[in-house]
Amino acid sequence: MATGGEHHVRERALNFWTNWVDSLTLPSHHREEVISSAITLRALCHEPTGGVLAAPTTSLPEGIGGVRNWDYRYTWLRDGSMTVRALLALGSTGEAEGFLSWLSGILERTVSPEQLHPLYAVDGSALTTEAVLNHLPGYAGSRPVRVGNAAEHQVQLDVFGPVTELLDELSDHLGELPEDYWTLTCQMVEAVGKRWFEADHGIWEARRAPKHNVYTRVMCWVTVDRALRIADRFDREPPGAWRQLREEIAHDVLTNGFNEEVGAFTVAYGETDLDSAALFVGLSGLLDADDPRFVSTVDAIERELRVGPTVFRYRYDDGLPGLEGGFHICTTWLIEAFIKVGRIDDAWDLFRQVDDLLGPTGLLSEEYDPVAEMHLGNHPQAYSHLGYIRVAQQLDAHRPS
């Protein structure tokens, strides 16, 4: 039986969450599911620091009994930006403002913005070395159990794009551009200008040699494009090199990223393997939705990477043993792509299949195995829930036939 003090604490918590949910702008459909996803994302935000967890767990396996077990209890620049953007799209600004304050604090301690790490501890400090806890058996015998994440030391040049998208959308929502946000914007473009042409480990953090990843180059273009959008909206004078840089990166992607033999944008320049992240060539606005190269990329990814209600990141050998499930966020990207190219009924059909995967708690893991019909990976996963919110909102304007 709850004591009076416990009852008071519960009542305060209920009032807090009820008032917060009441402040959100929700789609007209699947409202309870969107609320559940929003609460999940909000709970991953660390209010005292502004950091945002990618997931609250470590080493839940991407394949039962396998080695693909990672620690997600940290704040990625990419994931954090995308998470608070999803909450911002629902009308909640505090998480976005807190995250940008968190990032500004890190930049104050960083020599130059292009030297930002892909991820940090939730308090903004650098991670310790990734370690293996050999004395732990792991979930269902899935070893190793890891603490820390070696991706901290990788080169991931796409991270500046999501940050700049957040700055664009938050400043638009606020109707003003605080000086520190303009400073952040300029820092993101500065970082891209210095390093966009380098190979990197990419969004999927491959533990092998860097490549010229298509998604990374697209996000470098996004950085400059959104920065120019911010400058135009608030009558700021951008450095003259920004427009030239945007065109140079776009030319690079369109010249080198599309593989004529495959008929699609692929994972990296000169390669034939597909990658669901290549959908951002169109989702970002770099290519028009009706461009045949984007349409054929959507078709190829649906054909080769989709299995039932889920979409795999890729099918190529990434250097790690074992298999993994499809990624929920990749599935939501394909739904977005269907909307872009006008395949509204297909978008709704796939969305409903994702919705059917929500358990009784309304939570989503990182991945789904369509053969074993099992959720895999760390849980709950910010990526999965932010993707769900995003497509639910987009579908609100596109009713099925």
Residue ranges and their predicted role:
Residues 1-401:
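Acidic, mature catalytic/reactive cores of soluble proteins
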